[in-house]
Amino acid sequence: MLEISLDDSDLQRGLGQLLRNASHPRPMMRAIAAELLSITEDNFAHESWGGRKWPANARGGKILQKSGQLAASIHTASGSNFARIGTNKPYAAIHQFGGTVKAKNKPYLVFKVGDGFRRVKQVKIPARPYLPMSKGGTLQAGAESRLLDVALDTLARGVRK
């Protein structure tokens, strides 16, 4: 008769660590928030969302980078059950989702164009999504796998020797 004894102490230790990591998700959520920021920074750098290029702007130059304030305002937060990314800039939503800006307090919006000025009643801003999710909460192409990799790496910390 053949008898094999298996020392599964390493397996038991690893599974125990995995369970401990899963029961304390704050580090994983912090890592996910950091990855959301990294994806957003990639979007600004590549002027695209999930590989889809943003519409060009009329002034030329880097898109959504006239002053750099929008990109600099991106911040994250995380806790035991959430990872969040956002900005406090009042003009952020119009760039993320697009829309029409209309003159409110005066009859016209005024824009400097070259050496002169242009007056219009409204201007259509195309969507140039920079955050890695849509209005409906859908992640951009490639983001889901990046976030899953981060989550799995964080859960596996301390499991392998």
Question: Which ranges hold each PLM region?
Answer:
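Short, Lys/Arg-rich flexible segments
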Residues: 1-96, 102-161
